[in-house]
Amino acid sequence: MLKPLLIGASLAALLAGCSSHPAQPLDQRLLGEWQGTRDKNGPCQFFTWNSSFRADGRFEISFFADEQRTRLIQTERGTWTAHYGKNHLTTDGVKTTEVYDYRFVDADTVEYVSIKADPTADCQADYRFTEHRVGR
């Protein structure tokens, strides 16, 4: 009698330990290190950035005021998901999620178009940009 009860309790504990939310989808092609540059002649302030998308659903993006990436503006960290051509970025401490349409130009180049910007972002203009994989 005790053995079935222990098995049942163990199974219940195991199931309770599982997340009730499914794992968030991550487009595996986006994992890794990337670099981008905002258009110097575009509607928004010029800057460059390095971004890192990790398999644990975390991202880090460092923004620089120069092409050489020596004058750091700021670094943002947060969570990301990406699937079906949409990349969602939620920066730590910011309630609004930024959403981008994306498409691969080739295995190491991704084109993004902003469709939902963070209201605290430096530029609210719709814009597109390209990121290039680093170190491959």
Language model segments and positions:
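Sec-dependent bacterial lipoprotein signal peptides
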Residues: 1-16
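Lipid interaction determinants
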Residues: 18-77, 83-136
